[in-house]
Amino acid sequence: MDKKELSSLIVNVKDYPRSGILFKDITPMLNNAEAYNYAIDEMLSIIKKLYPDVTHIVSPEARGFCFGCPIAVRGGYNFVPVRKPKKLPRETNTVTYDLEYDTETLCIHKDALKEGDVVVAVDDILATGGTVMAIETLVKDSKATLKAFVLLGEIKGLLGSNFTKLPIHSVVEL
């Protein structure tokens, strides 16, 4: 498995979920154990090499969980789920942001992170940057330190990385 082969398993779906959107479908990659393991290994390697002081991985639902959970388990990190409203049972911090095709709200438990925690955010695809901004806000509001974003892929043409000054690392460019 290499990055080119991994990229070939991320399929473009035209006009989904709305007309004019080119959706990146990662399910063929998830359905290929070799590719999925390769992606997780590459992402974990970035974190271990560049951010040895990390204590927590945060990931947004739903596709971010596909990467954040196994990375947290394999790396020995705490995992913080970033969820949609009314999915977390206790008091939350919340942020609303714009996607390329909708408005979204994300939440974390208020006590999930604290000052002194060192965080890397893990997600699937960086597109327009809305989720990046939301996660950065949620982590900052918790007083933890967000070090970087580690992603399966980045759609460079959408300039989502312009919405943060933090490092963004992606396994593949889309």
Identify what each model region corresponds to.
Residues 77-119:
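Short, glycine/charge-rich flexible loops or terminal/linker lids adjacent to PRPP-binding catalytic cores
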Residues 55-56, 118-120, 148:
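Structural motif
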Residues 124, 129:
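Conserved G/P- and acidic residue-centered "switch" motifs that form tight phosphate/ATP-binding loops
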Residues 1-53:
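Active-site-facing substrate-recognition patch
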